């Protein structure tokens, strides 16, 4: 753990490559470098490089600071890799608002230093879940102005844990192309189920009902996402799922996230603690079939109880046709579940096994 003042001209000697990387970025920023290159996380396809101007990053930092009421001297916790936009924007906010930056190694089980009040941090869902499950870590956030969680959807379990806290935790929505978050939804002080855009952000749906975004953060150009959304007249919106994750099963279009939320609720009701997701795999009869993947070394015999529970909320055609248990899911370097690679590895191993028995 290291605490620095990013605007300072003198830094302590870094003890890890990550600390050195953070300090080098601070030096480049203060040197006036105009363009920075980042990679998308790759959680929804191949990572791609994107160049972002410092003015866009500075504007994003100003928006966040004005929204949360940041002040010079506040402490921001950095526990995400800075090669991705979610992590580097923690550093930029510290530079723009003259915050103290607490640097710890990125991990899904972050080693939060005790007795250091944190006012701001950005997390991915596994990190938030770990913190919420450990009372010893929560004390550091009691005076927080904003705990921002993004990069992936949060589970029902995480949301239930967050609602028990009295400090502000926000689910955020954004991407590399929008220079971090452009919208938020309170989950600790829950008001509704809709995300709300930050000032100056315009939203619309395209002909496929995918969300489109325009703001100063996008250089006032419309950006089309692959996220299917429901958009209200007041610009509040909900993400329904990824267009490219839709399962076309025998002519029925299934949105995995709409099925997953009910499976998560069932798991909580039954006291099951396991990561899971729904995805489509090739099927000779259906073309694709929906499958429930569970991270577990042992098979889950959920059988009829899960089916009967899901039938209360979904049509029979939306219910996963089978359950596949894998000992480990694949996560990318930003700590997010990579369901595409997890499924691809399963299909590859299944193909090898079938050929071995030919």
Describe each PLM feature range.
Residues 134-190:
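Gly/Ser/Thr-rich phosphate-binding loop
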């Amino acid at each position: 753990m290291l605490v620095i003042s990013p605007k300072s001209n003198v830094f302590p000697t870094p003890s890890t490559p990550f600390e050195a990387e953070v300090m080098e970025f601070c030096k480049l920023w203060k040197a006036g470098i105009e363009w920075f290159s980042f990679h998308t996380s790759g959680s929804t396809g191949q990572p791609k490089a994107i160049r972002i101007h410092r003015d866009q990053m500075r504007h994003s930092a100003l928006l966040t600071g004005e929204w949360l009421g940041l002040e010079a001297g506040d402490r921001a916790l950095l526990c995400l890799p800075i090669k991705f936009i979610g992590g580097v924007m923690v550093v930029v906010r510290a530079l723009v608002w003259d915050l103290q930056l607490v640097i710890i190694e990125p991990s899904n089980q972050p080693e939060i230093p005790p007795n250091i009040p944190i006012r701001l941090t950005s997390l991915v869902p596994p990190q938030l879940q770990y913190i919420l499950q450990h009372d010893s870590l929560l004390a550091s956030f009691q005076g927080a102005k904003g705990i921002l969680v993004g990069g992936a959807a949060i589970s029902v379990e995480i949301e239930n844990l967050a609602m028990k806290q009295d400090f502000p935790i926000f689910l955020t929505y954004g991407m590399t192309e929008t220079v971090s978050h452009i919208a938020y939804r309170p989950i600790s002080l829950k008001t509704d189920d809709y995300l709300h855009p930050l000032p100056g952000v315009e939203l619309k749906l395209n002909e496929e009902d995918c969300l489109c975004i325009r703001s100063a953060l996008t250089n006032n150009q419309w950006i089309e996402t692959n996220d299917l959304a429901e958009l209200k007249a007041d610009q509040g919106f909900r993400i329904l799922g990824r267009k490219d994750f839709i399962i076309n099963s025998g002519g029925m279009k299934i949105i995995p996230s709409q099925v997953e939320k009910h499976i998560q609720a069932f798991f909580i009701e039954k006291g099951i603690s396991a990561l899971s997701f729904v995805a489509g795999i090739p099927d000779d009869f259906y073309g694709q079939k929906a499958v429930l993947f569970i991270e577990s070394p042992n098979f889950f015999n959920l059988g009829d109880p899960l089916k009967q529970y899901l039938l209360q909320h979904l049509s029979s055609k939306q219910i996963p046709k089978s359950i596949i248990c894998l000992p480990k899911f694949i996560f990318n370097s930003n700590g997010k579940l990579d369901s595409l690679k997890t499924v691809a590895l399963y299909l590859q191993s299944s193909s090898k096994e079938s050929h071995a028995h030919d």
